[in-house]
Swiss-Prot record:
It catalyses: tRNA(Ser) + L-serine + ATP = L-seryl-tRNA(Ser) + AMP + diphosphate + H(+); tRNA(Sec) + L-serine + ATP = L-seryl-tRNA(Sec) + AMP + diphosphate + H(+). It comes from the Bacteria. Homodimer. The tRNA molecule binds across the dimer. GO terms for molecular function: ATP binding; catalytic activity, acting on a protein; serine-tRNA ligase activity; transferase activity. This is Serine--tRNA ligase. PANTHER family: SERINE--TRNA LIGASE, SERYL-TRNA SYNTHETASE.
Length: 423
């Protein structure tokens, strides 16, 4: 959530930055007008309350003198009625103001590329060689079905579209991957967590999913309103919601593997086959809590942690800086890692690493006490390390052999009981 004081102090500058994120200036102008009206009413209300206190003192003095205080009582009743009316108007204005501000995305960092959509993203680097085949490479869904390790037909029967069963070596490969990822992040100082897979709506608000992206989630239809997590970012970030941390302990780094549940409301017709876009998938998440002056160094380190997984798996990838028009709601800067998918002859997103600066911390009230004892908002960061199903897809396609078998990457063989080939 943005700081209303910052908007007030630099309205035109903030409006220009938000315009690069698709926010119309009219919305900011409405917010600006409401803020002015709100401050005017606060001044008026405080003046009337001071007047009411003064009249109350007069009434007490008159009554002590056994005099007639009816005039003062009538005056106080009139002032009280005015205060009540102003406070009611103030409450309505604050509600309207809040409705606007909670829907505004984060301000982009100065290094974030300005652009309308993914076409304006900027490639930062490419790492690794894309494989060459002396045969036509198959898509991972065909490989998985032919090997009997991925079953979409029965997943669809049991649940519906965009669900599947992992079976045998497929299930073991999935498990091997997330155990490997967690072990690697543990070596980098991340504390491993097992989180709740359902959260309350305050938690969804804290990380910025609610209210703007409510349609993208699965929510329990009872009076509790719990939500199946779309990413472990939500419970991990909200772990410290409403708390003040010791600045000397920052940065704090968490990692967790969890299922992620997404309705994919706006994805009809996109990636209808395979592991790229599912309603339920496993993902290893990284979350950091950092001091503001250290957060961009921590973003580079987090991105390197995600890259480390791809490098050790021997997968070719590229790093892309997302444009203002393609970046997530809560992010100030985002790097996407895109892995090479041979059957599609392109790179596909497998990780997204973001610095949210104090945007989530303000929504969730996560603060720290610095060395001078001052309490201030910290910065939050999150990143995939990695999306497990998409990593399975990348391994199946990049390590396929002409006979349809899959060579297991060497780094994963200890996690798969020494298995060298899936056939």
């Amino acid at each position: 959530m943005l700081d209303i004081k910052k908007i007030r102090a630099d309205f035109d500058g903030i409006a220009a930055k938000l315009a690069t994120r698709g926010v119309e200036k009219e919305k900011l102008e409405k917010l600006h007008d409401l803020d002015i009206k709100r401050r005017e009413l606060i001044v008026k209300s405080e003046a009337l309350k001071a007047e009411r206190n003064s009249v109350s003192d007069e009434i007490s003095q008159v009554k002590r003198a056994k005099g007639d205080a009816s005039t003062q009582i009538a005056a106080m009743q009139k002032v009280s009625a005015e205060i009540k009316a102003i406070d009611a108007e103030l409450a309505e204005i604050e509600e309207n103001l809040n409705e606007i501000i909670i829907m505004l995305p984060n301000l982009p960092h100065e290094s974030t590329p300005i652009g309308a959509d993914e076409d304006d993203n900027v490639e930062v680097r490419r790492v690794g060689q894309t494989p060459t085949f002396n045969f036509e490479p198959k898509a991972h869904w065909d490989l998985g079905e032919d090997l009997g390790i991925l079953d979409w037909e029965r997943g669809g029967k049991v649940t519906g579209s965009r669900f599947l069963f992992y079976k045998g070596a497929g299930a073991r490969l999935e498990r091997a991957l997330y155990n490997f990822m967690l072990d690697e992040h543990g070596k980098e100082g991340y504390t491993e967590m097992i989180t709740p897979y359902m959260v309350n709506q305050e938690s969804m608000f804290g990380t910025g999913q609610y209210p703007k992206f409510k349609e993208d989630t699965f929510e329990l239809k009872d009076d509790r309103g719990f939500v199946l997590i779309p990413t472990a970012e939500v419970p991990l970030t909200n772990y410290y919601r409403g708390e003040i941390l010791d600045g000397s302990e920052l940065p704090i780094k968490f990692t967790a593997m969890s299922p992620s549940f997404r309705s994919e409301a706006g994805s009809a017709g996109r990636d209808t086959r395979g592991l790229i876009r599912l309603h339920q998938f496993h993902k290893v998440e990284m979350v950091k809590f950092a001091k503001p002056d250290q957060s961009y160094d921590e973003l580079e380190k987090m991105t390197a942690n995600a890259e480390n997984i791809l490098q050790k798996l021997g997968l070719a990838y590229r790093v892309v800086a997302l444009s203002t028009g393609d970046m997530g709601f809560s992010a100030a800067k985002t790097y996407d890692l895109e892995v090479w998918i041979p059957a599609q002859n392109t790179y596909r997103e497998i990780s997204s690493c973001s610095n949210c600066e104090d945007f989530q911390a303000r929504r969730a009230q996560i603060r720290y006490r610095d060395e001078d004892g001052k309490v201030q908002l910290l910065h939050t960061l999150n990143g995939s390390g990695l999306a497990v199903g998409r990593t399975v897809a990348a391994i199946l396609e990049n390590y396929q052999n002409e006979d349809g078998s899959i060579t297991v990457p060497e780094i994963l063989r200890p996690y798969m009981g020494g298995l060298e080939v899936i056939k």
